[in-house]
C-alpha cells in the first residue's frame, strides 16, 4: 500500500522507479509519466485454423461486452464456424457484463440468470434483450477450470443450460453470492451477502458449505440433478461441472519443486541475452540438457510425499 501511494500522482507528472533486476548488482532507474492505463479484458482473439475462432476473456468489466462484440465480429468476418471461449482462471466481475455477453449468443427473451434472497427486493430476473450476433448453428466450446468464478460461471453455466455450448475442463470455483455494499462513511463500507445466483436450469452456482442455508430464507434447492433446455442431465452440486472433464497431469517431485522455487523463470532470465528474439529459441536437446544441468546445480529441497513430515517428526 505504501508503494502504491508513492507511485500514484497527477496525470502527466513524472515518477522515478528504482528496480532491482535479476542478476544485476545495481538498481536500474526508470522515469515514468503517469497516465490512465486501460487494461483489455480480452487478452487474445484470433483464428486457430480456417474454421475455429478463439477468444481469451480474463475478467468481466464495463468494457467486456464491447470487446467481445468486436472480437466476434472480426472472427465472423474470417468465416468462423466454431468458437472456443476461454474462461479459465477468470475470477469474474460485473454481472451486467456477463448478461450483455450472453446477449450476443442467446435468443431474445430467454432467461439468463436470476437472484433470490430473503427479501422481495433481492429477487431479480435477467433475460436476453437482443437478437444474438452469433448464429445459432455456430458450435461453441467453453473452457473452464477451478479458477473460473462468479460471472464466468454464469456465462458458462447459462450457455450449457440452454444447450448453446459444450463446457470442457475442470469443475469451476462455485462463487454464486450476491453482495450489497453499504457505505458507512467516507473511508469505510460494509459488504453483506443478500442473495444467490441461479441459472436457467434452476441450478445454484454457489458451492454448499460456504454459507448457512438458513441465512437466505427459502432459497435452498435440494435436487442435485437438473436438466438443460434440451433435456440433458447436469449436476447441481455447486459450480459448473464440465460436459467433458479434463484430468490434470501429475508432475514429478523435481518438476513441482523446480516450478515452486522459480527455476523456470530464473533460467529464462539468465539466458534471454543469448537470443535476439523469441523466434530464435528452439526447444532442442541442447537447451533441454542445459536446463537439466541448471536444475541439478540449484540444490533443490525435494521431498517425496510424506517425507518432510517424517523428517520433522524425526527431529522432535
Task: State the predicted function of each range.
Residues 1-185:
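Cleft-lining beta-strand/loop regions that shape enzyme active-site pockets
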Residues 36, 58-59, 118, 146, ...:
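A broadly conserved detector of short glycine/acidic/proline-rich loop/turn motifs that flank catalytic sites
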Residues 151, 157, 163-164, 168-170, ...:
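Polar, glycine-rich mid-to-C-terminal structural blocks
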Residues 204-316:
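Conserved functional hotspot residues or short segments at active or partner-binding sites
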Amino acid at each position: 500500500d505504501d508503494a502504491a501511494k508513492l507511485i500514484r500522482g497527477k496525470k502527466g507528472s513524472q515518477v522515478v522507479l528504482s528496480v532491482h533486476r535479476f542478476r544485476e548488482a545495481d538498481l536500474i532507474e526508470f522515469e515514468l509519466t503517469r497516465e490512465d492505463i486501460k487494461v483489455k479484458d480480452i487478452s487474445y482473439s484470433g483464428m486457430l485454423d480456417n474454421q475455429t475462432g478463439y477468444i481469451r476473456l480474463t475478467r468481466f468489466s464495463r468494457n467486456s461486452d464491447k470487446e467481445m462484440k468486436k472480437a466476434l465480429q472480426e472472427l465472423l468476418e474470417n468465416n468462423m464456424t466454431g468458437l472456443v471461449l476461454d474462461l479459465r482462471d477468470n475470477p469474474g466481475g460485473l454481472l451486467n457484463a456477463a448478461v450483455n455477453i450472453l446477449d450476443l449468443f442467446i435468443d431474445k427473451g430467454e432467461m439468463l440468470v436470476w437472484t433470490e434472497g430473503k427479501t422481495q427486493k433481492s429477487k431479480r430476473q435477467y433475460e436476453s434483450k437482443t437478437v444474438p450476433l452469433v448464429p445459432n448453428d455456430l458450435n461453441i466450446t467453453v473452457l473452464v477450470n477451478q479458477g473460473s468464478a462468479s460471472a464466468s460461471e454464469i456465462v458458462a453455466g447459462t450457455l450449457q443450460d440452454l444447450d448453446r455450448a459444450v463446457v470442457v475442463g475442470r469443475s469451476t470455483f462455485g462463487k454464486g453470492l450476491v453482495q450489497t455494499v453499504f457505505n458507512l462513511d467516507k473511508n469505510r463500507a460494509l459488504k453483506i451477502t443478500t442473495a444467490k445466483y441461479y441459472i436457467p436450469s434452476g441450478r445454484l452456482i454457489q458451492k454448499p458449505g460456504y454459507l448457512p442455508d438458513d441465512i437466505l430464507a427459502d432459497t435452498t434447492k435440494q435436487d442435485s440433478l437438473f436438466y438443460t433446455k434440451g433435456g440433458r442431465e447436469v449436476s447441481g452440486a455447486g459450480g459448473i461441472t464440465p460436459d467433458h472433464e479434463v484430468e490434470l497431469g501429475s508432475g514429478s517431485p523435481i518438476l513441482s519443486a523446480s516450478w515452486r522455487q522459480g527455476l523456470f523463470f530464473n533460467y529464462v532470465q539468465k539466458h534471454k541475452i543469448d537470443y535476439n528474439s523469441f523466434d530464435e529459441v528452439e526447444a532442442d536437446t541442447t537447451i533441454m540438457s542445459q536446463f537439466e544441468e541448471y536444475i541439478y546445480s540449484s540444490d533443490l529441497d525435494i521431498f517425496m510425499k510424506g517425507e518432510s513430515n517424517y523428517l520433522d517428526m524425526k527431529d522432535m
